[in-house]
Amino acid sequence: MIAKSNLVKVHDWLWEIPRSHRADMRVPARVYASDHMLDQITTDRSLEQLVNVATLPGIVGHALAMPDIHEGYGFPVGGVAAFDAADGVISPGGIGYDINCGVRLLCSDVPVSAIQPHLSELGAALYREVPSGVGQGGRLVMKGHDMDAVLEGGAPRLVEMGYGEAADLERTESRGKLEPAAAALVSSHAKDRGRDQLGTMGAGNHFVEVGSVEGIYDAEAAQHLGLFKDQVTVLIHTGSRGLGHQVATDFIRGMVRAMPRYGITLPDVELACTPFASNEGQEYFQAMSAGANFAWANRQLITWEVRQAWEQVLGDAGGPLRLLYDVAHNIAKIEEYRVGPVSKRLVIHRKGATRAFPGQPVLVPGSMGTRSFLLMGGEKAMAESFGSSCHGAGRRMSRTRAKKEIQGAELKQRLNAQGIVVNVGKLSALAEEAPEAYKDVNEVVDVIHQAGIARKIAHFRPVAVIKG
């Protein structure tokens, strides 16, 4: 385990593990955190995992971690790493099993007082319309050419099918579609796992949450985005479901077998990788892109389902639900950055990290029952963090421990007492996502804000939560 004494303070919100810490490090490792947060971060293996990332071939700049960092598979969750597209690697562990897990924010034109009398009914309608839980199938079954069209067409394909509007695509990262996607490289097993999962939430930390704008930090930016105090919002958090998980599984196995051919040795096999320019690297990138497109299509269909429930309960009085933005936080993308005196094409791995380009909305959901934030990316992110920010509160307690220490029924009562309507399939699943199982999202966001990576625009309080 890496101790606090192993880190050098760069400034109040940024710490560095120098290359001299371990002989195999190719670049330093850096973590955004307050002094207080660092005490908690050093209690697990996440910084050791970050140091391992710093040993990978072709890594550029620094191995980075956001303040919501915690242990993951290979890479820590909250990790960001950039690799030279010409001679660097791509690693599925740096994207994660839930390819393009991400968040979208919908906004209404009504204050929360307008829906308060209908909140229980709205929660029940959302739970009915948005299938949730492990193994729960959705309203569409995608096979053959239909599945391939979604894998290569992403959210635009769902809009073509009538499940959304053109404006949704304008407000989605990459317009909801990555071009290198190749459906032919997604295994039949992965496609079979995903065939009835479009428009489904899944379980774990995925959710649909109705909230309201509780605080505004930047009035001009909020007005530009169409936000106002007490406005009703809806957050949707989910990803590529079983299909994305299977894509990751298939290619991790293949890369473990392929690495000896490229002379790659690793401190942890969970970092399995191949050169980005290799056949294996290119095939994974194209299959991962297909998985990302499936996730965007999934969130697009869930948006349609949420709008259906909204209209059923509120009718014309509810008005429209417009998409403010959709961001991915488990993905690899090709982006260009200045490295020394030259501009380079880099493979940016974001695992539990959100793109934060200047002027772009950055969505940071909190833990269940706590506030969530809307930030806006800044120029400093482009210079310091490869255009990346945090993605959430970050776990501080394992799911197993949370289930042992927290009673789902008691938690539901506590949330109800806070005025939050809860619709959940299994109470044990509720316990896994209790607020005390996560870090303080206020502190996470403050670090990012103070570091200048992204600035606070608004925060939301939950009034209804739907979980699997």
PLM region descriptions:
Residues R104-S108, V112-A124:
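A glycine-rich phosphate/pyrophosphate-binding beta-strand-loop-alpha-helix module
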